C-alpha cells in the first residue's frame, strides 16, 4: 500500500488551544515541530488519528527523561550532610536507573550500587539514589554516568573512598545493531581507598552481590 503525504509546515498542525498555549509556555514548540518532522521522515502522517497529540507527548516525555540538566548537587542535597563521626562502609545497592544513550537516544535500564567510606561526614541515604537519578536523567554513556556519580560524592563528602558499579541493558544493543537482548554492560568507578586497597574493593564487590535474607 502506498500512502501519500503532503509536506507539512509548523503552521499546518493544530491542537487544542489550551494544550498549545501550555506547550508554548513550557518551551516545547521547537521539540514538537522536530517530532512532527521525524514522523513525516519515517513515512507517517502527523495529522492522522492517534498521532495528533504525539508531538506534545514525546516533547513532554523527553523533558522529563532529561530533567537532570536542570538540577544541581547543591539543590539536590539541600543540606542533608551530617557529621556523625562514622568511618565504615556505607552502601546503597540495587538503585534502579533509567537513562538514554546519547548516540541513538534509546533507553538503557539497569541498577546502580553506590558505596563510600566516610571521613566523618555522611549524606542522607535517599540522596545517593537522587544523585544517581540526576545524572541518569540526561543523555549519557554508561561509563561517564558511573564516573559522574563517583565524582559527585567525592566532591560533596570528601570521603576516604567512593565505589560505584552500574549494570545495565542497552536498547541500542537489544533493538538494533547486534540485537543481543541478554547482554548486560557493567562499569565501575573506584576512588580513594577502593582503588588503592584490593581488600576494601573486594568487600564492596562481595556486598553488592550478597543476596538479602529478608
Curated annotation (Swiss-Prot):
InterPro entries: GTP-CH-I_C/QueF, GTP-CH-I_N, GTP_CycHdrlase_I, GTP_CycHdrlase_I_CS, GTP_CycHdrlase_I_dom
This protein's UniProt keywords: GTP-binding, Hydrolase, Metal-binding, Nucleotide-binding, One-carbon metabolism, Zinc
GO terms classed as biological process: one-carbon metabolic process; tetrahydrobiopterin biosynthetic process; tetrahydrofolate biosynthetic process
Catalytic activity: GTP + H2O = 7,8-dihydroneopterin 3'-triphosphate + formate + H(+)
Keyword Nucleus: no
Superkingdom of the source species: Bacteria
PROSITE patterns with a match to the protein in the record: GTP_CYCLOHYDROL_1_1 (PS00859), GTP_CYCLOHYDROL_1_2 (PS00860)
Residues that bind Zn(2+): 101, 104, 172
Annotated S-S bridges: none
Keyword Hydrolase appears in the UniProt entry: yes
A GO molecular-function annotation: GTP cyclohydrolase I activity
Enzyme Commission no: 3.5.4.16
Pathway linked to the protein: Cofactor biosynthesis; 7,8-dihydroneopterin triphosphate biosynthesis; 7,8-dihydroneopterin triphosphate from GTP: step 1/1
One of the record's GO cellular component terms: cytoplasm
Gene3D superfamilies: 1.10.286.10, 3.30.1130.10
Assembly and interaction partners: Toroid-shaped homodecamer, composed of two pentamers of five dimers.
PANTHER family, per the entry: GTP CYCLOHYDROLASE 1, GTP CYCLOHYDROLASE I
Family from the record: Belongs to the GTP cyclohydrolase I family.
NCBIfam families: folE, PRK09347.1-2, PRK09347.1-3
Record's protein name: GTP cyclohydrolase 1
The species this protein was found in: Gloeobacter violaceus (strain ATCC 29082 / PCC 7421)
